[in-house]
A protein has these predicted regions:
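A contiguous, surface-exposed recognition patch within enzymatic or periplasmic domains that forms
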Residues: 4-149, 157
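Long, contiguous interaction/recruitment modules in multidomain scaffold/adaptor proteins
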Residues: 165-265, 437-439
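Structural marker of alpha-solenoid helical repeat scaffolds
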Residues: 296, 330, 363-365, 398, ...
Length: 481
């Protein structure tokens, strides 16, 4: 995922699926608490609510209104569901730090929810939505840093024949149920597996055997726990492919989970309110908050820098320069203020000032990549192609996924006549972003071959293809080409 602009953008990413709603559906959603949309309810116990209802069963949600449950309070890489009658289920896996958000959406079980069966879904009855997100709640928006690229991995999967999952990985789904002096295990392979399965109690190995499975193969076994204390914590380990611990609360979070928006009229509160509005793309309201924060505290460097960026985005670089300059008068080496000053100065044609302040910004890990790309673009404007290539390579040392740096580097290599290097950079760019149209257009510009031109044109298939061409034209215009 790429933010190709020189400005901070709203960060909002959720992956949503639809599955069949049924009375025997059990949601396997790790968590101790749930919250609703817009934090319309405080933290509520999950899965059993304050009235003793186990809300993880679809049938127990027959109370007025549609339901959104965002489950929090437990660190887990997986979640999903299980149908009791068919002993089949579904799941989602990603590293928790990549996608900590877990949500289930349930339409009202009354007639007001049933209308959506005909309006939204297929002909197989009502549906419900498991969803995975980069943040904990869909009311939250993050920051997508200027010029940055982000990537993560997630996997949706089916499973069957083992009962409800208690753990999952990209390799297998596990069910584990302790029944007296034995542990009933079930594995469903998501891909070929050949690993030692080890069961331990309180750190002592009780059972080990080789498990070899093909994709979708089921393995079941009852493991004798003789010698283990009834309350001993158990661990099931499938090589380095899956680990499950039964110790109660082993993955519970103790950190505070307070979901609230800042209030009050202090400079810091106004600044934080502005940040929230900016993340929601309510830019004019955000600017008003930043200006109010500056009025309350004229030396608030972060508010000055954010207001300067929004002035630049609004096409007012001169006013932006004044605000960023005031921030630099307070903190000369502030990375954000230097970066915003450099972007605004470039738009005003003050390239010496732009290069100087972007150079200071590039010393900060936060702005290194994007500031160096801006410097590389200025170097191309000034026909200093060697310096442009050096700046682009420097940007890539900190982030070799930097698509903007690769695009500028490709242009610099072409203008320097370095055909082999140009070809290598285009391959690098295509590996990072196979849908990057500029890579194919650059290949055409180097050789001017009709087949390369047609290859580029043939893959511009978006709903608004003219916008793709306009964006590419704007890129070359920024470089003075």
């Amino acid at each position: 995922w790429v933010n190709p602009t020189p400005f901070s953008q709203s960060y909002y990413a959720w992956s949503c699926a639809a599955v069949k709603a049924a009375d025997d559906l059990k949601y396997v959603f790790p968590g101790r608490w749930s919250i609703g949309h817009d934090y319309d309810v405080p933290l509520e116990p999950w899965p059993v609510d304050r009235n003793g209802r186990d809300l993880s069963w679809y049938r127990n949600n027959a109370t007025p209104g549609s339901k959104s449950y965002f489950t929090v309070g437990e660190r887990a890489d997986f979640y999903g569901g299980w149908y009791e009658t068919s002993d089949a289920g579904f799941g989602h896996w990603s590293r928790y730090e990549d996608m900590p958000g877990r949500k289930v959406w349930i339409w009202d079980l009354s007639r007001s929810g049933e209308i959506w069966v005909d309006l939204l879904t297929d002909r197989d009855g009502q549906y419900t939505e498991p969803q995975a997100g980069r943040l904990l709640n869909q009311s939250d928006h993050g920051d997508f840093a200027p010029g940055s690229a982000d990537r993560w991995r997630e996997q949706w999967f089916p499973y069957r024949g083992i009962g409800p999952m208690v753990q999952a990985s990209p390799h297998a789904v596990l069910n584990a149920a302790r029944e007296g002096a034995s542990l009933r295990l079930g594995l469903f392979a998501l891909r070929p597996v050949a690993e030692d399965l080890v069961v331990s109690a309180a750190g002592t190995e009780l059972h080990r055997e080789r498990v070899v499975l093909r994709a979708e193969q089921i393995w079941k076994k009852d493991i004798d726990l003789a010698g283990a204390a009834p309350d001993a914590p158990l661990e099931v380990r499938l090589g380095d492919k899956l680990v499950h611990a039964t110790a109660p609360g082993s993955d519970d979070l103790e950190r505070p989970l307070r979901f609230s928006a800042p209030t009050g009229g202090s400079a810091e509160a106004l600044y934080l309110q502005g940040r929230g509005l900016e993340r929601e793309r309510r830019l004019s309201e955000a600017l008003d908050k930043y200006l109010a924060a500056i009025a309350a505290e004229p030396l608030h460097v972060r508010a000055l820098a954010r207001a300067a960026e929004l002035r630049t985005r609004a096409g007012e670089p001169a006013r932006a320069l004044d605000l960023a300059g005031r921030a630099l008068a307070v903190s000369m080496y502030d990375p954000e203020a230097n970066y915003v000053y450099g972007v605004a100065a470039r738009r005003l044609g003050r390239l010496v000032d732009a290069k100087e302040t972007l150079g200071w910004a590039a010393r900060s890990p936060q702005f290194k990549g994007v500031a160096l790309v801006q410097s590389a673009e200025i170097a191309i404007l000034e026909k200093d192609y060697e310096r442009a290539a050096e700046s682009a390579y420097a940007a890539l040392t900190g982030d070799n996924h930097n698509v903007n740096a690769l695009e500028v580097l490709a242009v610099a290599c072409r203008l320097l006549g370095r055909k082999r290097e140009h070809h290598r950079v285009l391959g690098w760019l295509s590996d990072q972003d196979p849908l990057d149209h500029l890579a194919r257009f650059e290949r055409y510009l180097l050789g001017r071959k009709p087949r390369d031109r047609e290859a580029c044109r043939a893959l511009v298939r978006g709903e608004l293809p003219h916008e793709t061409w306009i964006e590419m034209a704007a890129f070359y215009h920024r470089l003075g080409l």
